Amino acid sequence: MQPHLDNNSNNDDVKLDTLGEQNVLSSAENITLPEDTFKSYMTYLLYEMAHYKPMIFSFLALSVSILIVVIFHNVKACDVVFGFSIFVTSILFLSTLIPFNVYISDEGFRIKLLLEVITHRPAVKGKEWRAITDNMNQYLLDNGLWSTRYYFYSSERCYKFFRFLVKEKPPGVNVNSSVKDATSTQIDAPANEASNEVIKCFSFSSDPIFEAYFVKAVEVEKQAQQEYWRKQYPDADIP
């Protein structure tokens, strides 16, 4: 009698897991990301630039300099001074474009991303990444790390950021060159070796919490990669 009850319990757990996955995928389809909101990437970029304060200040300074030169164009001394000011403000304006697309390095943000991956266990190119992207965009806005809710333009860009994070050595880690690249090769390593390499690489991390989440997220990504490539090459006997 007991085995029969155990089987029913296992079946119920499987059904609940399946329903849970279906609910996550269904909700992910209803999420609106910047790529769905804006007509093109250029319009998205212009919108972001208009809400980026350093960009706004530089643009105003450049506009004022040009206006002053136009008004006082008959004064030779002013032409030299204001011409130089236009050059300087132009450099400042262009320099704001460099940090505009730099990866955010806030540790809380990165831990949040790792936990999102651990929780949702997304497949490679899976719809779960839409939910993760939406949550991360909201987190950035709520914590004042970005001025809009559109930091990640698409789920693909969020996934690329995660891959960048996985391959990056966290600050405070002191490892030798033979172990330094462990995270960049963990996807191709056998299952029983990947975790050991990652743990060895981060055994000197100054943040054990980040280290623990990092290792777990790497394992989730490794499983997703293996499943993805098994489906792509079913006859390749991929471990």
Curated annotation (Swiss-Prot):
It comes from the Eukaryota. It is found in: Membrane. Keywords: Membrane, Transmembrane, Transmembrane helix. Residues 1-54, 105-239 are cytoplasmic. It is a multi-pass membrane protein. The keyword Transmembrane helix applies. The keyword Translocase does not apply. GO terms for cellular component: cell periphery; fungal-type vacuole; membrane. The chain crosses the membrane at residues 55-75, 80-104. Disruption phenotype: Cells lacking all 10 proteins of the DUP240 multigene family show no obvious alterations in mating, sporulation and cell growth. Belongs to the DUP/COS family. This is DUP240 protein DFP3.
